[in-house]
Amino acid sequence: MIQTTVLHPKHLEAGAKMVDFHGWEMPINYGSQLEEHHQVRTDAGMFDVSHMTIVDLTGERVKAFLQHLLANDVAKLTVFGKALYSGMLTPEGGVIDDLITYYLGETFYRLVVNSATREKDLAWIRHHAQDFGVTVTERPELAMIAVQGSNAKAKAAKVFSAEQNAAVEGMKPFFGVQAGELFIATTGYTGEDGYEIVVPQEQACDLWQALLDNGVAPCGLGARDTLRLEAGMNLYGQDMDETVSPLAANMAWTIAWEPSDRQFIGRAALEAQKAAGSQPKLVGLVMEEKGVLRSGMPVTFTTAAGEEREGVITSGSFSPTLGYSIALARVPRDIGEQASVEIRKKLVTVKVTKPAFVRNGQKLV
């Protein structure tokens, strides 16, 4: 049985093209994926992300629990509302999921995890929470709308109450605050400014309509994917999964090695991988010739020593902002500044870059 979010009627009203996204009927676009992409880069767009899973954790030992569960360290969160991004790993060091954790009280944290991984995530979290006496509460009664773009905050301000505007004033990136009925966070998946707004389901359609009335354009999953790829943000299931180490997924920055006695799940495996130095890495690829880089395409190059090497594209697409094709690729660590990709039986040269292409409207390549 396919699931729908509470905003489903709003999508149909706007003429959205709906697709099955991991068991959810979601809008892929509202007419033009390209226009929706540019809308976010130049103005403001909004996404229904109510399919994401919100999990609240409470208990006296919740901090110690999360220090065990996550590769990043929640001890870094010293101010209420601050958030961090982390991988949740298997004992072998593979990525079960990537998620955001909000520090909302001494005994209260909130996680936002991916929808496609909901069941395994909840089972894993609940299993390990038992040892710490932590209560795990999924919040399916909450919807979520991401408002993203250079003008997103200004347009959202017209919809917020005076109390809500006061609560978010001057809020830095990666913070969240409960303001009235809304939980408003300065997070996103586009590389632009904006908010992710958690709202009770019964108020979600009214909030969506108010944002629409104030010039925020609805955007589908198609634009969400090209925006996150331009920003160099990983997509779980494509750029990493349980077979992939965070060291091979441009997630090394999310591993808190200190304090050295914090025994998080997967630590021993990661330490061995790090010592061996043999993990591949995730890089960016840019192709200015015609054609589109796609997930699964092999990437080949010759090392300085003349040895042939091969990697694979994990995510690829035409970049609407740059006007040519870009990709993320997992490749051996000794890759140089150029590589080759086979497109229509022809080897095409691609430039190897850092895995981020556009952030805050600025081209990085």
From Swiss-Prot:
GO molecular function terms listed in the Swiss-Prot or TrEMBL record: aminomethyltransferase activity; transaminase activity
GO cellular component, one term: cytosol
Catalysed transformations (reactions): N(6)-[(R)-S(8)-aminomethyldihydrolipoyl]-L-lysyl-[protein] + (6S)-5,6,7,8-tetrahydrofolate = N(6)-[(R)-dihydrolipoyl]-L-lysyl-[protein] + (6R)-5,10-methylene-5,6,7,8-tetrahydrofolate + NH4(+)
Tagged with keyword Transferase: yes
Entry keywords, A to Z: Aminotransferase, Transferase
A Pfam family that the UniProt record links to this protein: GCV_T
Residue intervals passing through the bilayer: none
Superkingdom in the source lineage: Bacteria
Quaternary structure, from the entry: The glycine cleavage system is composed of four proteins: P, T, L and H.
Function: The glycine cleavage system catalyzes the degradation of glycine.
Family (UniProt): Belongs to the GcvT family.
Official protein name in the record: Aminomethyltransferase
Organism from which the protein derives: Aeromonas hydrophila subsp. hydrophila (strain ATCC 7966 / DSM 30187 / BCRC 13018 / CCUG 14551 / JCM 1027 / KCTC 2358 / NCIMB 9240 / NCTC 8049)
Gene designation per UniProt: gcvT
